[in-house]
From Swiss-Prot:
Taxonomic classification: Eukaryota, Fungi, Dikarya, Ascomycota, Saccharomycotina
UniProt membrane topology term: Multi-pass membrane protein
Membrane-crossing residue ranges in chain numbering: 34-54, 84-104, 121-141, 161-181, 212-232, 240-260, 307-327, 366-385, 408-428, 433-453
Gene (name only): ALG3
Major enzyme class: transferase
Organism: Komagataella phaffii (strain GS115 / ATCC 20864) (Yeast)
Name assigned to this protein: Dol-P-Man:Man(5)GlcNAc(2)-PP-Dol alpha-1,3-mannosyltransferase
Amino acid sequence: MPPIEPAERPKLTLKNVIGDLVALIQNVLFNPDFSVFVAPLLWLADSIVIKVIIGTVSYTDIDFSSYMQQIFKIRQGELDYSNIFGDTGPLVYPAGHVHAYSVLSWYSDGGEDVSFVQQAFGWLYLGCLLLSISSYFFSGLGKIPPVYFVLLVASKRLHSIFVLRLFNDCLTTFLMLATIIILQQASYWRKDGTTIPFILSLIAADTYSLAISVKMNALLYLPAFLLLIYLICDENLIKALAPVLVLILVQVGVGYSFILPLHYDDQANEIRSAYFRQAFDFSRQFLYKWTVNWRFLSQETFNNVHFHQLLFALHIITLVLFILKFLSPKNIGKPLGRFVLDIFKFWKPTLSPTNIINDPERSPDFVYTVMATTNLIGVLFARSLHYQFLSWYAFSLPYLLYKARLNFIASIIVYAAHEYCWLVFPATEQSSALLVSILLLILILIFTNEQLFPSQSVPAEKKNT
């Protein structure tokens, strides 16, 4: 047998070097096998970016000082929400917001040490990023290309919302991301029985309730949360009521000082009434000058109650359509009619063995997509979006672009156009119309995706062609 001659090494030429660099860049951006290396490096790089922003960009006080003024009144003993004001208006957030900013007030000398608060929000941002990266990996099981992780850290506006504005939306976002990953874990561990998933569903109800207690926008997730809890609890309605009870009890516990459940005198009734009236005011009016999404409409239309009713109707209709898609027979393992009838067998589990929630490979993806899509529907039909509201869905946007089956280049273009909409200040007719169009496009592409929850054996490049 003749000896095997070693292959000739490629020559060190400029052309070969450039070719190697191009191949490396392509792998770093588009090869899913590189995501496990790229994502941690992005997190570390973004932690440096956060420090640079805090150290070089001036903090802008929009609501934070008003939050501190409101907290000061509460610390003086005022519990009646109708008497708690700051420079920008009355206190309109639930008790979780009060507790969170009370802690910040305590450690920042009443808000005077803004640098400390910025650092706290910097860590909060990095926590959100870490949870998002973990959820992405868990959902895609290593199949998501690195470019979508790059998009996770690419929003200038999102960085500003966290460390230069200090809005309470940031804490709600963190708690919702925590809730999602706990639900993902609950679905995954069904492969080993039902006890661990049930315990995790109770923990998820806890974090979800805490998110609601900070800001009401977390309620946009409620339909998805209830659906997933029902599935994780074996389609046993009695069992699923336990997480719902936890959710309610946490609300009572967090808001105890204002709800005063054991007191029924006139003063307690007034404090309780003011709390629910202001902290959970669904009829709150928004200012036209701050709207990011409906600027292409006239101010008269924006303030018209019939327009608000239309948005609510479209929200419900779209939500129902997506729920029907999520509950397709191939996902739940039985006809939809049987699923509905089984709800009335509330005393026993009726979950099909072939339900997607029982598939540890696909259920984390199902959980994330159902939660993120339901939230995005609420965002699309919101009566108004202010600049800080970007944080409501920014961390899920790259994943939703991935689920929309856009190719890499299209995803980058859509993301850049979306970021442009949030950077324009004040919003214009063009930027707001573009924003609504982008959100609508993403939802349409997800809805028309016939392979929304493919087997993980399907190569990633097949999903995005």
